[in-house]
Design a protein with these regions (language model features):
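Fe(II)/2-oxoglutarate
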Residues: 1-87
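Non-heme Fe(II)/2-oxoglutarate
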Residues: 82-148, 174-177, 209-211, 217, ...
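Short hydrophobic-aromatic micro-motifs
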Residues: 95-96, 195-197, 269-271
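Short, solvent-exposed loop/turn segments at secondary-structure junctions
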Residues: 100-102, 169-170, 202-204, 216-217, ...
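A generic secondary-structure signal for well-formed alpha-helical elements
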Residues: 116-120, 157, 203, 273, ...
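Conserved double-stranded beta-helix
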Residues: 126-137, 148-218
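Double-stranded beta-helix
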Residues: 205-275
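Catalytic core of Fe(II)/2-oxoglutarate
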Residues: 245-315
Length: 315
């Protein structure tokens, strides 16, 4: 059979695809101008094209305990949220129990079942991710714009947020530790935020979510740290496993402590763009772990995908 050619590594194919979807890149045109990035919006983009690799988010530059009590809107949040806002700079996450009620979680589950049965939503071939249901379902899209939630996320980033994607899981992800910012990246760094929603109870056997408190304070691990071989026409030669190995080494080096989120249906976990997290191995393959992740970008920043060097398409 010989060696198979990986055509996805060729950037010119990305450029053609981006040109076809040019309207979905309009969000970056104003941001490129704002940050003086002189580059076509259809072109490949990575951290190499920016002048720095530092987060500019206000709660990364300063400490939440000192800053958030003085910000307009802080007093409007419930006490359970205010307490966790104060520790955001230390922890990099917020847990809200029973945030979504039975009506909301059943709505999401029903919509996913409907889309799968109608063959409008298909799991990725190498995992069980169901991508972008928010683009296919008005009820799910409405949930991504939940006003209480977007108000909180906008407060955390000090910028208006916009939902980029949803990922639905039927089973546990079995995903190794990673930071979302290798997949969905911003310039300046720090302007992505994620919300994980438990659509059923989790337990030690169905592959619960894990995370490393405080890991968001580590330097961002970007292509230049592991993805050697990028050229003008091709992306780097290393694969995603190399990135995961670097994260694993970093966890050992820094002696990070793992926390496991044994969530109940309706609970949510909000995490920082750079918080290291993943999914524990599924001990019982017969069990489901239904959940949905929503990734949000801040509205007025450059949005792209570091690992593939492609600009984000917002539809």
């Amino acid at each position: 059979m010989g060696n198979r050619i990986n055509i996805k590594k060729y950037k010119f194919l990305h450029w053609i695809y981006n040109l076809i979807h040019y309207k979905s890149l309009s969000h970056n045109k104003a941001a490129y101008k704002k940050y003086a990035i002189h580059r076509p919006v259809i072109a490949s983009i990575s951290s190499r094209n920016f002048p720095d690799k530092e987060s500019k988010a206000w709660l990364d530059k300063g400490h939440s305990r000192e800053l958030v009590p003085h910000k307009a809107g802080f007093s409007h949040f419930p006490d359970t949220i205010r307490r966790q806002l104060l520790t955001w700079s230390d922890n990099g996450y917020i847990i809200l129990e029973s945030y979504f009620d039975e009506t909301a979680t059943s709505c999401i589950l029903g919509e996913i079942e409907r889309l799968v049965n109608r063959h409008k939503l298909h799991p990725a071939p190498d995992n069980n991710k169901l991508m972008f249901a928010n683009r296919l379902s008005a009820p799910i899209r409405e949930i991504t714009y939940d006003q209480r939630l977007t108000d909180l996320l906008s407060f955390l980033l000090d910028k208006e947020v916009v939902p980029f994607q949803t990922i639905n899981f039927v089973h546990g992800s079995n995903q190794r530790a990673h930071s979302d910012s290798i997949h969905m990246t911003t310039y300046p760094l720090g302007y992505l935020i994620a919300v994980w929603i438990a659509l059923e109870d989790t337990n030690p056997d169905n592959g619960p979510l894990f995370y490393y408190p405080g890991s968001h304070r580590l330097p961002y691990l970007l292509n230049s740290d592991f993805n050697e071989g990028t050229t003008l026409l091709t992306v780097g030669k290393k694969n995603y496993g190399d990135y995961e190995d670097r994260i694993a080494a970093l966890i050992r080096e820094k002696e990070l402590k793992k926390e496991v989120f044994l969530a109940k249906k309706g609970d949510i976990l909000i995490w920082h763009a750079n918080l290291i997290h993943g999914g524990l191995p599924v001990r019982d393959p017969g069990l489901t772990r239904k959940s949905m992740v929503i990734h949000y970008y801040a509205k007025d920043v450059i949005k792209y995908h570091e690992i593939t060097e492609r600009p984000s398409l917002l539809k």
